[in-house]
Amino acid sequence: MLTDMNISSRASLKNITELGADLGLLPEEMMLFGHTKAKVELSVLQRLAGQRKGKLIIVTAVTPTPHGEGKTVTSIGLTQSLNAIGQKACACIRQPSMGPVFGVKGGAAGGGYAQVVPMQEMNLHLTGDIHAVSSAHNLGAAAIAARLFHEARLGKKEFEAQSGQAFLAIDPNEIRWHRVVDHNDRCLRQIHVGLGDNNGPEYESSFDITAASELMAILALSHDLADMRARIGRLVLALNTQGQVITADDLGVAGAMTAIMADAIKPTLMQTLNGSPCLIHSGPFANIAHGNSSIIADDIALRLADFVVTEGGFGSDMGFEKFCNIKVRQSGQAPAAAVLVTTLKALKANSGLATEVDSNVSNIHVPNINATNINAPDQARLEAGFANLNWHINNVARYGIPVVVAINRFATDSDAELQWLMEAVNASAAFGCEISDAFSQGEAGAIALAQTVVRAAETESQFKLLYPDEVSLEAKLSTLAEVGYGAAGVSLSIEAKQQAQQLTALGYGHLPLCMAKTPLSISHDPSLKGVPKDFVVPVRELVLHAGAGFITALVGNVMTMPGLGLKPGYLKIDIDAKGEIVGLG
């Protein structure tokens, strides 16, 4: 079979203006970037304010493995197949970060005959939104550092006299706004700034990957430009010497940060291999952020299409949980149905029968199954791994959403094992189960899946949140740990307990939680496979994201700045003699 790059490069593409017109966009509602992509103006929301909305489908997966489950392949394939059976469908997915592209995971445009094209344009830069987020974020960091420098240099009286600004009395030990870059770079996890003469007070700082920036979450959760401006103004950049918050509005930098992101708030329109529309917007990770594409993209697509297919990052304990408890809480747009992606490989890998350390991913345990024997029939391992799938089925169902299981077929899969798995799923709480061949067959490979999803979406969804706003932060943590993960309980560090009290006292106790934990286990420990039991979730820190509207709980050893492994993806990427990019995939 051809590589993803080969398939993408051979694709016959619609002109982007034709694609937009087919979706229902007017020429003036598209800001063109060549012939293959365009930003969508938010004025379309005003024009279609009274339009009946379509149905939202959320795609999630079992606990992820290094073998890949094909969630984006399924999202794109389902969108293509919905259009093929006469439904008007649009996909809404996140913009890939270049960190994973050059790291282990690779691109995020789908694959095979179910991908967004041109895939190299999607995976590298796109229309520059991530760069805009990085620049706006780092302007905030530069502004707080400069203010600290000038206030320390001049003192209160002289600073106010010379600058005409209020003295903020920034506590250098309480600067909460650090810097970001869109690469995996572990050496930037802990740094000192202000070293040397005349460079400002020295303080400890760090870099996060841009996908973890609160601005990325704001981009994904804003309803319009005015909402984004208000949210950026609420960003907590530091505390003063009295323990009070200093916001981006207090610093006077919120307007400039918003200006940098003024075009980034517009989703980017691209197409799949069969000419189905796809809106790409925002890129928060699901392990260290809320892991879903934007509310704005969904809102535009829902006013133009019968079905909108979106996805949450990683497994249902990660992106799907945050889709429900953060995104839907803020958007008010509940899904009509969910698709849960699995593979035979994933279930065997999640069987918990053996593990080893993957040499390419530091501190991540993966199944001790090489590429040869994981493809071989192994009924015992498959049955043991089914417990993980069944847990995810029940996890989705607890939100009142009908769930359709999609088995992403590989060429090496055993027909007997596929048949056993379908029978096992049909005996579970799932609405239905279908095998998807979208990777190898494109739109023709997911027709049955599309038909079953349509039937599931016609049932009455009884969506419900996992917890209400008004309960305490400690109660929310307990609910997420015990109900959301099946834990025996939750333990807070001394620092986390103090932060919970402080956040409540400052008036932020009503906010939802964003759990930052490993995606490689339902628990906090990546070595615990299958369906872990009798574990306690350790919360080491609570981080306020007042602009985004949630509080992040850092669990276990999760990092907000990834590192590159022994065999990073950039080793394969180059330019050929024709000037074409090669090695992406």
UniProtKB/Swiss-Prot annotation:
Keyword list, A-Z: ATP-binding, Ligase, Nucleotide-binding, One-carbon metabolism
Domain of life: Bacteria
Keyword match ATP-binding: yes
Record-level Gene Ontology MF annotations: ATP binding; formate-tetrahydrofolate ligase activity
The enzyme's E.C. designation: 6.3.4.3
GO BP annotation list: tetrahydrofolate interconversion
UniProt KW Transferase keyword: no
First-level EC class: ligase
Pathway: One-carbon metabolism; tetrahydrofolate interconversion
Reactions listed under catalytic activity: (6S)-5,6,7,8-tetrahydrofolate + formate + ATP = (6R)-10-formyltetrahydrofolate + ADP + phosphate
Any Pfam family matching the protein: FTHFS
Family: Belongs to the formate--tetrahydrofolate ligase family.
Protein name per UniProt: Formate--tetrahydrofolate ligase
